[in-house]
């Protein structure tokens, strides 16, 4: 309902609702067909990321003339769940692999807060589905531009009990996608 109200009150907001949730990758594919504007920002509905940080990404894109801005997470809570260690190990490993293969210095390749210029966004063709799509668009973004910016963003992680869907096999698929997109 909140999004419908925004769409009604602001003509530059376009909302698309699906009958069945098929994940963020599917939503991004739909967005590629309908989105317009100068900048594209991906925001998860679960609000693990603070929407106030959108301004930080946008400021870097505009002032520093960056085509792609990716966040790197700062935890909003001091509560650490046991699986965070393994998640951070996986994210750090994926980030290291991406940086080695693509010659970048990204701090957190799994951060879901990303901003693209429209020109860059329309030239990215995600080659995967589900969670792999996220890594595919990052790989293609860094292949297509060297104008990359980064900024810290606040992050409040959910647990599996809270509805977190990311499991260990996502890391394996991401690893595969980073390699496949590099050599294709």
Predicted features, each with a name:
Residues 18-34, 39, 51-131, 157-175:
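Acceptor/aglycone-binding surface of glycosyltransferases and processive sugar-polymer synthases
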Residues 10-13, 65, 103, 145:
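A generic structural signal for alpha->beta connector loops
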Residues 2, 52, 176-184:
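Terminal low-complexity segments of carbohydrate-biosynthetic enzymes
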Residues 1-16:
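Acidic donor-binding segment of Leloir-type glycosyltransferases
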Residues 18-20, 45, 151-153:
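Cofactor-binding loops of NAD(P)H-dependent oxidoreductases
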């Amino acid at each position: 309902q909140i999004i419908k109200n925004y769409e009604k009150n602001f003509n530059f907001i376009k909302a698309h609702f699906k009958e069945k949730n098929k994940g963020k990758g599917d939503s991004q594919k739909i967005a590629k067909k309908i989105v317009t504007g100068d900048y594209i920002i991906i925001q998860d509905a679960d609000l693990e990321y603070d929407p106030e940080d959108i301004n930080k990404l946008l400021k870097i894109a505009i002032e520093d003339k960056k085509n792609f801005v990716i966040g790197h997470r700062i935890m909003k809570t001091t509560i650490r769940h046991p699986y965070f260690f393994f998640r951070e190990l996986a994210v750090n490993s994926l980030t290291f692999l991406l940086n080695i293969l693509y010659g970048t210095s990204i701090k957190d390749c799994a951060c879901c807060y990303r901003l693209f210029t429209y020109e860059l966004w329309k030239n990215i063709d995600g080659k995967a589905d589900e969670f792999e799509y996220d890594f595919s668009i990052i790989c293609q973004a860094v292949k297509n531009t060297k104008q990359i910016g980064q900024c810290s963003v606040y992050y409040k992680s959910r647990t599996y009990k809270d509805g977190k869907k990311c499991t260990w096999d996502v890391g394996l698929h991401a690893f595969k996608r980073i390699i496949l997109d590099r050599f294709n």
